């Protein structure tokens, strides 16, 4: 990654639902130096497996880095893809099953600018030296 992102572990373990990615070799113009970070915190339904989450992360990373245009357009494409994933999972549930829902924190560092999108209960703290 172009940016030095320190990842702090929670009780010595990776944070469940957190994912960070650097640009792929083939990406849309303007995405070369972008850093993508996602945090999905499931709020209801049976737990989504780590394998399913990883496949979602792989898919939306590809979508983000291949989407041309503004950073916010690429972020919107990621949010729409994740929402579609949740809808697909929920459509397969029985009537008695509790639907899946999740909070999302999505951040992109583009050059020296931080873009943040959030859905559901979440917060962002920006800390800097000085």
Which stretches of residues belong to each language-model region?
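PP2C/PPM-type serine/threonine phosphatase catalytic domain
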Residues: 1-130
């Amino acid at each position: 990654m172009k940016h030095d992102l320190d990842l702090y572990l929670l009780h010595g373990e990776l944070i469940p639902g957190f994912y960070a990615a650097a640009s792929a070799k083939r990406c849309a113009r303007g995405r070369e130096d972008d850093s993508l970070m996602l945090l999905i915190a499931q709020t209801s339904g049976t737990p989504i497996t780590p394998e399913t989450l990883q496949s979602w992360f792989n898919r939306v990373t590809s979508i983000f880095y291949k989407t041309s245009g503004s950073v916010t357009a690429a972020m919107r494409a990621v949010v729409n893809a994740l929402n579609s994933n949740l809808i697909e999972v929920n459509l397969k549930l029985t009537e008695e099953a509790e639907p899946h829902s999740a909070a999302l924190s999505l951040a992109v560092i583009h050059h020296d600018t931080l873009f943040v999108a959030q859905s559901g209960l979440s917060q962002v703290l920006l800390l800097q030296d000085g």
